[in-house]
Amino acid sequence: PLKYAVYDGRQLALKISANSVYGFTGAQVGQLPCLEISSTVTGFGRQMIESTKNQVEAHYSRQNGHEHDAQVIYGDTDSVMIKFGTTDLAESMRLGEEAAGIVTKTFIEPIKLEFEKVYYPYLLMNKKRYAGLLWTNTTKHDKMDCKGIETVRRDNCDLVKEVVETSLRAILIRKDPQSAVEYIKGCISELLLNKMDLSKLVVTKALTRTSDQYASGNKQAHVELAARIKKRDPGLAPAVGDRIPYVMIKGAVGAKAWEKAEDPIYVLENNLPIDTAWYLEHQLSEPIKRLFEPILPDNVNSLLEGDHTRRIHKATPTTGGLMKFAKVTKQCLGCRSVLKGTDGALCAACEPKQMEVYCTKLKTVQSCEQLFSRLWTQCQRCQGDLHKDVLCTSRDCPIFYKRKKVQKDLRDAKDVLRRFDADW
């Protein structure tokens, strides 16, 4: 075992060294550019994949007495994926081991093709994008393996990752595509009605350089936002290397993406409306289409349009734009009619229902207090002390934005409740 471990470590070191040298030779700009070497390496790889494909498909065919015609459905770099046609897991593993042995005999030593795993079920979207349940034994799947899709990518908001992962679990594990369809429609409806938690809509990107170091015509959302934050408060200005969180808010017609990016805390404090259409079009639509095109080839657009997309929430901003010139008037808390010349809570018509309206607003305050207490206690447990203030400012934590939002909601709800003081 010791000798094997030494040799295994040695061959791994050689492999990493060879990979590094290959990377150097394939780089257009660098210390060791030599495209002939890198092209030769990839050429041999393609040749071996093609040879493997031809051997497997020729050997495992009905003409040779097999039950199904095998098909190599995917090949990339140093691996191939074979569809043997059988639905029996144990038989697939046996055929995989057997095929690896047959192909290895045709390779020059020490090149060896090894059987690694079985995907069942398996969803291949396109090159370098696939997902499936990974099996290395016949008793239980090891995990749900995803490559190149939004569950493992960092350039999407958490909503996209959650939607894709939940849908994949419904399709692959529960084998219930219809429940995935209903879930997608429900999420889109929640998004358009502005019921989605803000933490799920936050996009983060690394600030690799300052705004003046980018080309003048290449404005990026997170870079421009960093410059705006610096103007508002130089003490909060992000530094190069920081990850900038932002959400997209509604802007003027034809506004660019970099003009609509805004700090999530600033959005919460100023009640700025989220551009839900942008999230649907630029974040959700393509991943959903890629995921469901193999399942609903003729009806995939029904996920993005229909009854569930017809109700849209329109938020009212409290600052900026025309609100600078608007005069805020108080409304009756019962019927929402405009109150003239009074600081009270209700109009004359709603005065008889004063206690009923008050109890409704009081329940709102109590609900916010309960939610805030739960989130506050959860943050205290996380920092390891239930008797100190929460000092955490980690924006990567999903509770952070929930806590900030419920703090604002609680303040607003208490302000509403105080309006009854003028009547009593």
Task: List PLM regions with ranges.
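DNA-dependent DNA polymerase catalytic subunits
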Residues: L2-S17, T42-G75, I82-L386, S394-W424
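Active-site-adjacent bridging/hinge elements
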Residues: I16-V29
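Gly-rich Lys/Arg/Thr-decorated short loops/hinges at beta-loop-alpha junctions or inter-strand turns
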Residues: G26-G43
